[in-house]
Curated annotation (Swiss-Prot):
Belongs to the DapB family. It catalyses: (S)-2,3,4,5-tetrahydrodipicolinate + NAD(+) + H2O = (2S,4S)-4-hydroxy-2,3,4,5-tetrahydrodipicolinate + NADH + H(+); (S)-2,3,4,5-tetrahydrodipicolinate + NADP(+) + H2O = (2S,4S)-4-hydroxy-2,3,4,5-tetrahydrodipicolinate + NADPH + H(+). GO terms for cellular component: cytosol. This is 4-hydroxy-tetrahydrodipicolinate reductase. Keywords: Amino-acid biosynthesis, Cytoplasm, Diaminopimelate biosynthesis, Lysine biosynthesis, NAD, NADP, Oxidoreductase. InterPro entries: DapB_C (IPR022663), DapB_N (IPR000846), DapB_N_CS (IPR022664), DHDPR_bac (IPR023940), NAD(P)-bd_dom_sf (IPR036291). Its EC number is 1.17.1.8. NAD(+) binds at residues 10-15, 36, 100-102, 124-127. The gene is dapB. The active site is at residues 157, 161. PANTHER family: 4-HYDROXY-TETRAHYDRODIPICOLINATE REDUCTASE 1, CHLOROPLASTIC-RELATED, DIHYDRODIPICOLINATE REDUCTASE. Pathway: Amino-acid biosynthesis; L-lysine biosynthesis via DAP pathway; (S)-tetrahydrodipicolinate from L-aspartate: step 4/4. It comes from Rhodopseudomonas palustris (strain BisB5).
């Protein structure tokens, strides 16, 4: 079987460079395209060199339609507007679209869902094995404990992260809500400030911290009467997300059109 031909979107960014390095380390995949935003000063540069590798001859381009001719998939950790633009082209080409972009709105998610009758999309707020196992455990614990245990999710990331709560925190919140059989949108408590009154029973709280170079720390706290359960994950290098994205792409290659998650990829959907 020939290598899976992949495009990295946002190839000049931190995650894009990590993805390029991960592809170079992984059997069965090859980098055939590197996408960057129109007007970027990085256009035309070699993706390998940008990632700290030997030159690989793949130049950064802003033309996804041309890059995607003959490709098998695209790895997309960019920004919502770019991802939504990429969704349409990936669907037209019928290639695997792995989406790790965070900060997507409900309308963005609706656009993504609308193409999955013809597109193969793997979308997750976090691509690492550890975080998805944490999400599965969160769902199980939330299911097992009654509303007497309050759920709080605390996350910390580097000072340059532009969205909050993180996509991973929301992934964990969705897992907790699923365990409680409630809608997260109706039970989410964010950004408490001032005189907020007593905590509402059944809320799922979020706290976001930003500073330094933290790759990603997440804790799910179940606080009950006189006892507390904490589940936590600390990411030490974003390469865990890059290798997870590659696992997702290879798993999805050849699958029927649809919207999948890392829970599907890792076999944790029914955990």
């Amino acid at each position: 079987m020939s290598d899976m031909r992949l495009i990295v979107a946002g190839a000049g960014g931190r995650m894009g460079r990590a993805l390029t390095r991960a592809i170079s380390e992984t059997k069965g995949v090859v980098l055939t395209g590197a996408l960057e935003a129109p007007g970027s000063e990085l256009l035309g540069q070699d993706a390998g060199v940008l990632a700290g590798l030997p030159a690989n001859g793949v130049k950064l381009s802003a033309d996804l339609w041309t890059l995607s001719a003959g490709a098998d998939g695209i790895l997309d950790f960019t920004v919502p507007a770019a991802t939504i633009a990429n969704v349409a082209i990936a669907a037209q080409r019928g290639i695997v679209h792995v989406i790790g972009t965070t900060g997507l709105s409900s309308s963005d998610n609706a656009v993504i869902k609308s193409v999955t009758d013809q597109a193969i999309v793997v979308k997750s707020g976090n691509m690492s094995l550890g975080v998805n196992l944490l999400a599965a455990l969160t769902r199980r614990v939330a299911q097992s404990l009654d509303a007497g245990f309050d759920i709080e999710i605390v996350e910390m990331h580097h000072r340059a992260k532009i969205d909050a709560p993180s996509g991973t925190a929301l992934l964990l919140g969705e897992a907790a809500a699923a365990g409680r059989k409630v809608d997260l949108d109706d039970h989410s408590a964010r950004g408490r400030d001032g005189v907020t009154g007593a905590r509402k029973t059944g809320d799922i709280g979020f706290a976001s911290l930003r500073g330094g170079t933290v790759t990603g720390d997440h804790s799910v706290i179940f606080a009950g009467p006189y006892e507390r359960i904490e589940l936590a994950h600390k990411a030490e290098d974003r390469m865990i997300f890059a290798h997870g994205a590659l696992k997702a792409a290879q798993w999805a290659h050849g699958k029927s059109p649809g919207l999948y998650s890392m829970m599907d990829v890792l076999g944790l959907a029914e955990f």
